[in-house]
Curated annotation (Swiss-Prot):
PANTHER family in the record: MANGANESE EFFLUX PUMP MNTP-RELATED (PTHR35529:SF1)
Protein name stated in the entry: Probable manganese efflux pump MntP
Organism: Shigella sonnei (strain Ss046)
Membrane topology field: Multi-pass membrane protein
Regions that span the bilayer: 3-23, 66-86, 106-128, 143-163, 168-188
Subcellular location: Cell inner membrane
Molecular functions per Gene Ontology: manganese ion transmembrane transporter activity
Principal subcellular localization: membrane
Gene of this entry: mntP
Cellular component per GO, a single term: plasma membrane
InterPro entries, A to Z: Mntp/YtaF, Put_MntP
Disulfide bonds: none
Length: 188
């Protein structure tokens, strides 16, 4: 996977965390930068670990399905991207129903895990490709750190508008990467 695809994947994977951070930022009254950075660090750390876990799981199975690798990555990315788009169009966001209060550490960790399950599934798919998983996981984590911190800071202004559009955009990016993987396989 080339650098462009890695960066697109990283920011595509960060969109769930961005959307959750926008929602969290929207529920707080003037979130401080330190709160936004803490959220970004937690989300980024979890989002770095989950593709590594998924990659490890995928490596265990890779010798059994190596000839299907491009199809597995394609189907996973299409599925995850489609799910993100559907969630983006649904409109109901549990984060919007929380009262305006500061968010505790464990609530942030739980939210980070929930938004990073897609990254674990992508990690499974990446096990079947020629990819530097450490660099990819770090790129995903860094993108998530940036996007989650930014999401918290702008959340109070645009939470109800961009939150769902971010999921739609992230889903489209994942689908685009899936199509690119399949295209590269068939067209060299």
């Amino acid at each position: 996977m080339n650098i462009t695809a890695t960066v697109l994947l990283a920011f595509g994977m960060s969109m769930d965390a961005f959307a959750a951070s926008v929602g969290k930022g929207a529920t707080l009254h003037k979130p401080k930068f330190s709160e936004a950075l803490r959220t970004g660090l937690i989300f980024g750390a979890v989002e770095t670990l989950t593709p590594l876990i998924g990659w490890g799981m995928g490596m265990l199975a890779s010798r059994f399905v190596l000839e299907w690798n491009h199809w597995i990555a394609f189907v996973l990315l299409i599925f995850l991207g489609g799910r993100m788009i559907i969630e983006g169009f649904r409109g109901a966001d549990d984060e919007d129903e929380e009262p305006r209060r500061r968010h505790g550490f464990w609530l942030l960790v739980t939210t980070a895990i929930a938004t990073s399950l897609d990254a674990m599934a992508v990690g499974v798919g990446l096990a079947f490709l020629q990819v530097n998983i450490i660099a990819t996981a770090l790129a995903i984590g860094c993108a998530t750190l940036i996007m989650s911190t930014l999401g918290m800071m702008v959340g109070r202004f645009i939470g109800s508008i961009i939150g769902k559009k971010a999921e739609i955009l992230g889903g489209l990016v994942l689908i685009g990467i899936g199509v690119q993987i399949l295209w590269t396989h068939f067209h060299g």
